[in-house]
Design a protein with these regions (language model features):
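S-adenosyl-L-methionine
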Residues: 1-51
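A short SAM/SAH-binding and catalytic strip from SAM-dependent methyltransferases
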Residues: 122-133
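Conserved class I S-adenosyl-L-methionine
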Residues: 53-62
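C-terminal substrate-binding/active-site "lid" region of AdoMet-derived donor-dependent transferases
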Residues: 132-192
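Conserved SAM-binding motif I beta-strand of class I
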Residues: 77-82
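Glycine-rich SAM-binding Motif I of class I
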Residues: 64-68
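Conserved SAM-binding loop
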Residues: 91-92
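Conserved SAM-binding strand-loop segment of SAM-dependent methyltransferases
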Residues: 101-109
Length: 201
């Protein structure tokens, strides 16, 4: 099935509207909203790394695609954090109609100031912000970990070289695995992957 049809099919099935890029309020620190392709999310869901007992935190959630899809497919709890009020309202509108809305929460907040709930043990990023903000967010995640030690997996889709270089220097993080997604798209782009890091107890 081609990507465009797959996008429409899943939005219809989940009873949400998440397609389309949005550059509103994007700047050098916070990047435009662009949803993760459903084909990539299917691969993540099929990995078995996110399950019913997990709580997923999605930074820069936009209209909530990751949250609705993963909650529907894996039955996990999901929290989406979005700083853009206009896009956050679209996520909340989707929540009213979405199939899996009962397991999804949204927070209107700046990621670098958001307190990570102690139940969160899976965290998703699709290049939502600059390296400068990522460092502050990782510090928040580590604070949450030290308050309640548990295994936390961090998923980075389409990561930049600077993201990976930085993550490799964080003592508490260890590289765990990667999910190759190059075959889903034309061009054999080496960034088409989900890189997984872990904070282990």
């Amino acid at each position: 099935m081609n990507e465009e049809k797959n996008e429409t099919r899943w939005d219809r099935l989940l009873a949400v509207r998440t397609t389309g890029r949005d550059d509103t309020n994007a700047d050098q620190y916070r990047y435009p909203y662009e949803p993760t392709p459903y084909s990539v999310l299917e691969r993540l869901a099929n990995s078995g790394l996110i399950r019913k007992e997990n709580t997923l935190l999605d930074y820069g959630c936009g209209k909530g695609r990751v949250d609705f899809f993963m909650s529907y497919q894996t039955r996990c709890q999901s929290i989406g954090v979005e700083y853009n009020e206009r896009i956050y309202e679209k996520a909340m509108n989707n929540k009213e109609s979405a199939v899996a809305s009962g397991r999804v929460l949204f927070a209107l907040a700046n990621a670098e100031r958001y307190t990570v709930p102690e139940t969160v043990d899976r965290i998703y990023f699709f290049n939502p912000f600059s390296l400068e903000l990522l460092k502050k967010v990782i510090a928040r995640i580590l604070n949450s970990y030290y308050e309640n030690r548990r295994t936390v997996k961090l998923f980075f889709y389409y990561p930049s070289d600077e993201y990976i270089a930085y993550l490799m220097t964080v003592e508490e993080l260890s590289f765990s695995d990667e999910i190759d997604c190059r075959d889903l798209f034309d061009g054999n782009n080496v960034r088409e992957k989900i890189v997984i890091f872990e904070i282990a107890v």
